Amino acid sequence: MSRVCQVTGKRPAVGNNRSHAMNATRRRFLPNLHTHRFWVESEKRFVTLRLTAKGMRIIDKKGIDAVLAEIRARGEKI
């Protein structure tokens, strides 16, 4: 399963660890992903999404129906 938020599209970023001596070693910055079930009243079913904490805040703000419409418009199957 890929580490990509289904709402925001955030994915792992790359950068460097820096030691006290400023030596650089490559690392990945992973998104804060959670698997969460949402009840969709209009469909009378649960929908499971893999999303970041920011994605959950977006759903709280816009509503699950609006967010699902955007995801389906992108062509993702839910």
Swiss-Prot record:
Keyword Ribosomal protein: yes
Record-linked SUPFAM superfamilies: L28p-like
Cross-referenced InterPro entries: Ribosomal_bL28 (IPR026569), Ribosomal_bL28/bL31-like_sf (IPR034704), Ribosomal_bL28_bact-type (IPR001383), Ribosomal_bL28_sf (IPR037147)
GO cellular component: cytosolic large ribosomal subunit
Pfam families: Ribosomal_L28
Record-level GO BP terms: translation
Keywords: Ribonucleoprotein, Ribosomal protein
Domain of life: Bacteria
GO molecular function terms listed in the Swiss-Prot or TrEMBL record: structural constituent of ribosome
Family according to the record: Belongs to the bacterial ribosomal protein bL28 family.
Protein name: Large ribosomal subunit protein bL28
Organism of derivation: Histophilus somni (strain 2336) (Haemophilus somnus)
The organism's taxonomic lineage, starting at the top: Bacteria, Pseudomonadati, Pseudomonadota, Gammaproteobacteria, Pasteurellales
